[in-house]
């Protein structure tokens, strides 16, 4: 078994993309390969085959390997709820909420969970491609590090460092990062990968020669900027959508603790849809469909929505015949009240909902985590997705469910048919279900994208790019595989 770790000079340097590319490259050559991310901080997560929860990027990398996502692949997941606190998930299961200082003190215990997960994964796969988090050179985070070099040192695995040249300063990033590492960490660093290059490579060659001479480390490859690459994003929301004249306008309010924004990726690719995220202070655009997204702090995000005056805009939209869809936390907002007696998401208390569905929600411990499929009640079309929520919703509105999932009702639709919502994520991934929702909202003759097929094409594109631009023979030799 060989483990290679991909670290980055900065956040968003391309670590997740490079790991996905490596996973698909090894899988295509018959290796038994799996991704591993010791610690991740993200609001976008996926349900695993063993009933746990991991970061979305790691789940994508598992698909690149051709294996089902498993909790061992991301043993520590932190889901921010406030600027100072997060929900802590260990090996797929919720441990509880912690403030930053409390979690820092807990890291030694978390480190044991990371090591155990890596050992279990290593016993089942030939190759492990591990991914760091942020930068390994964050001086204030080096004590008890489990995300980057702390993990690499403990399991004695080699590391490659990725830098994004498109942002500028790539040589300062790489040399500065290496200089801030300890002697042993520098020794285990095999070399570098430069990501997102555009232009004539011959103009970069002098810099590459200087970098290799100064550091004594090879540049394994310069990866090109891939225009039009669309894969599941994990952190920042890609606010770009189609902007065709006469397109069907889908509007999503950008909430501070918005979660699982990957729900909207198929709409971003839809040739007839103009997907728009409305940010704080922006004018509310014309909309055919408004979608209230999932949230990791539903009551706080609902208060933010009201502070922006967006509730009035949505009410006006409904008054003029528009449609509103709520997903998970957004579904809870559509009801009359949200109760959080245990303070699971923020301070304990209750908040009035938007009141468009006759129902109330109580947040309870014991998160629901499942991959499910079923059918729309009104259209009898297939739906497939996943649930990640703490809410228990009750009320008259549930007598008119939106979905039937494996023999049980889910969601609700208003009597006038203009408002509906459910707990299910992934509503737009299957073309038939995407078409059903868009037709309900008023779009005829839909041409929805099969997102699973699209995702596979993008992963193959990454592996093809790696084949052409990365010296995999040399990298494999350095790995010892």
UniProtKB/Swiss-Prot annotation:
<comment type="pathway">
    <text>Cofactor biosynthesis; adenosylcobalamin biosynthesis.</text>
</comment>
<dbReference type="Pfam" id="PF01656">
    <property type="entry name" value="CbiA"/>
</dbReference>
<protein>
    <recommendedName>
        <fullName>Cobyric acid synthase</fullName>
    </recommendedName>
</protein>
<dbReference type="Pfam" id="PF07685">
    <property type="entry name" value="GATase_3"/>
</dbReference>
<dbReference type="InterPro" id="IPR002586">
    <property type="entry name" value="CobQ/CobB/MinD/ParA_Nub-bd_dom"/>
</dbReference>
<keyword id="KW-0169">Cobalamin biosynthesis</keyword>
<dbReference type="InterPro" id="IPR047045">
    <property type="entry name" value="CobQ_N"/>
</dbReference>
<dbReference type="GO" id="GO:0003824">
    <property type="term" value="F:catalytic activity"/>
</dbReference>
<comment type="function">
    <text>Catalyzes amidations at positions B, D, E, and G on adenosylcobyrinic A,C-diamide. NH(2) groups are provided by glutamine, and one molecule of ATP is hydrogenolyzed for each amidation.</text>
</comment>
<feature type="domain" description="GATase cobBQ-type">
    <location>
        <begin position="247"/>
        <end position="433"/>
    </location>
</feature>
<dbReference type="InterPro" id="IPR011698">
    <property type="entry name" value="GATase_3"/>
</dbReference>
<dbReference type="GO" id="GO:0015420">
    <property type="term" value="F:ABC-type vitamin B12 transporter activity"/>
</dbReference>
<dbReference type="InterPro" id="IPR027417">
    <property type="entry name" value="P-loop_NTPase"/>
</dbReference>
<dbReference type="InterPro" id="IPR029062">
    <property type="entry name" value="Class_I_gatase-like"/>
</dbReference>
<keyword id="KW-0315">Glutamine amidotransferase</keyword>
<dbReference type="GO" id="GO:0009236">
    <property type="term" value="P:cobalamin biosynthetic process"/>
</dbReference>
<comment type="similarity">
    <text>Belongs to the CobB/CobQ family. CobQ subfamily.</text>
</comment>
<feature type="active site">
    <location>
        <position position="425"/>
    </location>
</feature>
<dbReference type="InterPro" id="IPR033949">
    <property type="entry name" value="CobQ_GATase1"/>
</dbReference>
<dbReference type="InterPro" id="IPR004459">
    <property type="entry name" value="CobQ_synth"/>
</dbReference>
<feature type="active site" description="Nucleophile">
    <location>
        <position position="328"/>
    </location>
</feature>
